[in-house]
Amino acid sequence: MNATPQPPTSAAPVRLERDGSVGFIVIDNPPINAGSLGVRQGLIAALGELAGDASLAAGVLIGAGTTFIAGSDLREFSAPLADPQMPAVIAAIEACPKPVVAAIHGAALGGGYEIALACDARVALADAVVGLPEGTFGIIPGAGGTVRLPRLTDAATALDIVSTCRRVKAPEAKALGLIDAAVDELRPGAAAFALSLKGAKRRLRDLPAKPVEAEAFEKAATAALKRGRSRPYAQEQVAALRRAFEAPFDAALAEERAVFQRLRQSDESAALRHLFFAEREAARIDGLEGAKPLPVKSVGIVGAGTMGSGIAAAFLAAGLPVTLVDLKPELLDAARQRVAGFLAKAAKPAALTTSSELGALAPCDLVIEAVFEDMAVKQDLLRRLDGIVRPDAILASNTSYLDLDAIAAATAEPARVVGLHFFAPAHVMKLLEIVRGAKTAPAVLASALKLGRALGKVAVVSGVGDGFIGNRIYNAYRTQCEAMLLAGALPEEIDGAIEALGFAMGPFAVSDLSGLDIAWANRKRKQAETGDHSDVPVLEWLVAGGRLGRKTGAGWYAYEDGRRSPDPAVAGLVVKARAERGVTAASLGRETIQNRAMAAIVNEALLVLEDGIAARPSDIDLVLINGYGFPRHLGGPLWWAKTQDRQRLEQALQALQGLKRRGDLARLD
């Protein structure tokens, strides 16, 4: 090996660097070295150069910067793919007469790992990860991933890796056979491995699939279909891995590519790609140019209930020490046990401090109130905290409905107040609504966004308004579903229709899970504020009868052994409500229920945009997907609305009951 590598002979995004008898093919396409058209062209050219240079005995594929190839360029997927496509790159690697080793640091994902699988060997740094996460985008690997992977590890394990979309860390990857070696220094380690092959090719296409244990594979297939809710991509994942050991190599390869192309062009894949880009767009906030986040190295939380405990667990899991305060000391022991149960071994118990004194929060960089949803209670607490915490500390409210500006007004410096609306369970749910008050300082908002990333949340900024983005839209949806009770449907019929669309749960099942008293308390608050008592009275009657949902064994449904079932008593209350309102019930079909429910969501989402509560349609899609069980494969309510026939959507909006405002469908354009 030369002490000083020779300078590159070709330009970015791919170049060949000579170092002794090893040619390093360097992918330099920041930030993630995506396998774009330019990279594909460059790889084929560099492989040809490697093959034609008699002074080079072997090649090494390596990424510049922080990663190997972390995936394909998704921006290309919405149009016909330009040649050369990824299979041509794979073929060029296999056709190269000299051994080629993939040197992996950072991540080799999707098409990046498929390129590594085409190589004659794979070496990686200990902290590298590999994986085939194409299912995230509603597709399967399209360049041999499902055909080559079962030649390194058994088909059941391969299916698990493909269907979970998980990133396999190098030590596990080595144990499973996904890489050949873990090295301490990537460049010299890869070069040494390449030369150790002594010119021999080790193509996976020349190997048979690993022996198959039928029972293990069928178990993995059942799990994959359940995980993917039998969506088309999940069915094709199973079929592709089955072909890998049942069909000839090239036949399996050709069918995999055909399925990939078909799924890539599907509505579901387009919706999932939309969500991928929406998450990145959500971080771009007007007015934050140059804003520097404040350092947050310790967190205080007031309120040791389920929500406060979940928030504490989320921060502890992210490595931040937490001080949890509740003015009722008897609640703290239960909270500590709850947090420990949430975390298991994810964080050291010593990182959690509990106290019944607000003064314990004085050193914290961020203090979050997670107390009862009552304006006076929250204002009083913020007023007291304002005199305890440091002047440069951030104060946050976990309110899910209330006016953040009114809460912030209780402090001497509203600029340091921001809304951090977590969703229960807070250590699990991906969504974090960040509420920007009228006086919230840019640095405080920037800090909240940075914290959202640190917690692994999908953070979306909302303006101030009752219910912010998500709860406002959800309330409109729930109101319309209750109106359909009067019109002629029953809770189980509405929930069944909604769940058939792909929602995790229908609105009445959700209400039973969260507690009818929660919904009723919010409804009473709004009635007091607006004087509007037009809501369907069934909820009020259920609460008055002590039917609060799952926690009392009865709500919209009856619960026996934890299983929900329709309750004739609820049907009787619905009939009573119809009689009181003078409504003659009509049969509502599943499609009618679905159309009205979706139209209610779309209409309120359009109004949220119109009122400036959400910055962009894609932010609303993220909120409904990550916090409210909206079907991910539909891409969110406004993405879905854009794909619908405009005239039919207009008719569905017109059919909504008791609508006070109509959203403008032109906003979809």
Can you annotate each of these PLM segments?
Residues T66-A70, L109-G110, L402-D403:
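Short, active-site-adjacent cap segments at secondary-structure transitions
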Residues M1-I62, A91:
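Conserved CoA-thioester-binding segment of acyl-CoA-metabolizing enzymes
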Residues A102, G106-G112:
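Gly/Ser-rich catalytic serine loop of serine hydrolases
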Residues L61-I62, I69, F77, A102, ...:
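Redox-cofactor binding/interface segments in oxidoreductases and associated redox assembly factors
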Residues N2-V14, D28, R40, P80-A88, ...:
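N-terminal glycine-rich phosphate-binding loop for ADP-containing cofactors
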Residues G38, T66-A79:
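Amphipathic alpha-helical interaction surfaces in cytosolic regulatory modules
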